[in-house]
Each structure stands twice: as structure tokens, then as C-alpha cells.
Amino acid sequence: LERYNGPVLFEAPAAAEILAQQFAPRLLAFREPVSDDPRFDLFIGQTMSQMGLGSFADRLGSRVLPDFLDVTDDPRPRDFRGAPLLGGQAVDDDGVVPRATLLVERGVLRALLATRVPARGAPRSTGSRREWGGPAPSNLVVAATRSAGEAQLRRDLLERARARGLDHAVVVRRVGPAAASTALSRLAAQMGGGAEPGGSALAEVWRVFADGREELLRGVEIAEMPPAAFKDIAAAGDRPAVWSGEFMMGAAHGLGPGASVGSEQPVVSCVAPALLFEELSLVGARGPFPAPPVTPSPLAGR
């Protein structure tokens, strides 16, 4: 795959992971540091922009998702339909008891996650200060008021691809770790190829055809994922899945305001259905790729 511009279907676990990586950091409220050094201010501004921090501070009351999606951060539940949720906590690092916070209602941004440090768009704490020193989600739950089954999502995906003159579409089943994504992006950009910094490496990507054929693609990254990509989500599935992992924002993009060297990354959980994006730009990472072993492992088949 050299480049693909078209509809992309993220199956449920991958959809939850990409939301945790690319959408959740925009839901955090930060107060920008004030200094008398314009170079420091420029550095902090560029860092926060790259991380997406503060990008929704001026978007309260504006649409950031389609009108059939709601997003809630809720530290209280321990599981979702039997799958454990690992992001909950009884009290945050500021000593504030966290509560369920409706962040996005019918696609409209209603609130941001905040600490006790006042910030634009967040006049009070939501009990979200976590290990890394700043706000972070706990259990992020994405709910769809309008959903479709797996077969319908696949048909919709292929129809949208056909309308663009494409003979295939793309399905993402696993997303790579955020830290690896950013490292790969920066390395590729420095070497003159691949995605620009800020993209996400995708661990398992398939090219799908109308006749049912599927081809595995290697070394695929999202070139960029602007906020508009989330507004243009076309459909959602009817079977939510859980993804849990480290909230790698600080480690992947550089330390954000309030983070400290050596600070731990909080564990978060995200619940989301499959999501059909109207349009994303994917690029193939340039090789060389590691070759498979010449002989099979002696442990193979055991």
C-alpha cells in the first residue's frame, strides 16, 4: 500500500484503541504555562498542538462527533458485559472523588476532563488527575444511538469505496501502541518517507473486496487524523468491545504540562463499537521489512 484515501472501518477493539489514542487527548483541559521566554511559550504551544491538548478548549457547545454518538467518562463500573474495566479509581491524585462526566452528547462537546488546576473550558475538577501529573480518562464509554450489524457495516464500507471509484476498501482490526506509532512516524519523516509525526501505526490492516476476498497489508500508518475525521464518522456497529492499556500520551508525544520525568502512565479503558470513518489517509511505511525466518521455529507445532 503506497497511499489510500477513502473509507476505513475500524472493528470494535481497534475503534476503542484509536479513540483512546487520537480522540481522548483532545478531551483534556490544560492551563498553558506562562513565562517571559517566547521560545519556551512557542515550544509548549507546538508540543500541546502536536498532542492535541487544549484543541477542544474552544469547542464546547460545538459538534465534534456525529449526532448518534455519546461519550462518557465513568470511573465507577468495574466491568462491561463481563470484560474488566481497569481505569476506575476511588479518588484521584488531587484527592478529588471522581464522578461520571458526560463529555459528548449527541455529537456535541459538553465538558472536558480536568484537575484542580483551573483551565480554559473547565472551571472545576472532574476528579481526573492521574499518575502522569495531568488529567487523563478513566473508563471512556462511547455509546451509539444508531447502530448497524457487522454485515451492514461491511456493505456500507464497500459502497462508499465504490462511489469513490475504488475497487477495494480497508478494515483495521488492531492498532499499534501509541509510543511505537509516534516513533515510527518521526523516523519515517526524517528519512523522507512514510507518515508525518502524529500518525498512528496500525498493527493489523486488511484490504477487502466486494467478492469477499481479503488481503493482509503490512506497514500501514494513518497519515494524519484531524478532528474533522471524527465528525465525519458515518456509522457505528452494534457490538461494543473493550480496550484497556496505558494512556501513552506523555510517553508518545513528549512530556505535557504537569508531567514529570519518570512519571507513570495511567491505565485507561475504552468501550466503543466498530466505527466507519468516511475518509482517512493511510500510507505504507517504506522498507526494508524484517524477512521471515529461513527455517521454522523448533517449537512450532508443539
Pin down the residues of each PLM region.
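Internal alpha/beta scaffold segment
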Residues: 1-55, 59, 63-67, 110-111, ...
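Dual-mode signal for accessory low-complexity, basic/Gly-rich regions
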Residues: 45-302
